[in-house]
Amino acid sequence: QNSPERVDLTWFDNHCHLGDDAEDVIARARVAGVSGMVNVGTDLEGSRAAIALARSHPDVWATVGVHPHEARHGMDGIAELLGDDTVVAVGEAGLDHHYDFSPRRQQADVFAAQIALANERSMPLVIHTREAWEETFAALDVEGVPARTVFHCFTGGVDEAGACLGRGALLSFSGIVTFGAADDLRAAAAACPLDRAMVETDSPYLAPVPHRGRANEPAYVALVGAAVAAAMGRDVAEVATATSANARRFYGLDQDS
């Protein structure tokens, strides 16, 4: 019953990056039972492209934001895009102290600006944090945690999960939850209340086992969900239903859209 190939289940991929092959990828996702996808902006150009794609697909929504890698380019033009009907969140925004592609001062400033935007607009905030847990929590505590906040591609353990959940945030689990070495992450999933969990692919990155190392796509989100269900000790169908409902509620989507 818990086979991830069950096509009677519907899933919601709440974080992906759709590229030039988006039409084919979206079509395959629908066949695989994916009822919706949030296509995430990482800079001004990418956010504009995400909006354009979402306008032509009723089951695709966009976010607008500046990824920490792109923080050196600033925030120009971002706020103006938030009013589009297809835009459901600010982000992905945050801190990446692993790569440091942008100076940390600029990362911090751009993250703070996006937390403030989410609060001003009463919009969800999508967070990217890597090797910067304490700094990320500190920024949120200073600016105020938006009422709807998600830690995308959550990679922490039980302690980090508690710190996120304690701030009212949701955790979004990616294909990493299927990786052999990810015991700490599975422990975090087991500790996460079902109403605070979402699933994502982060396509085209982080393909779940057995596709690891190849291009990822939203059609594979069921593999992520099955691994989360196993970690939680819950039925896959229950996790599919709950994470989809959580995503629609989090992003403010109508149930019939």
Write out the residue ranges for each language-model feature.
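Mid-domain alpha/beta scaffold segments of enzyme catalytic cores
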Residues: 1-257
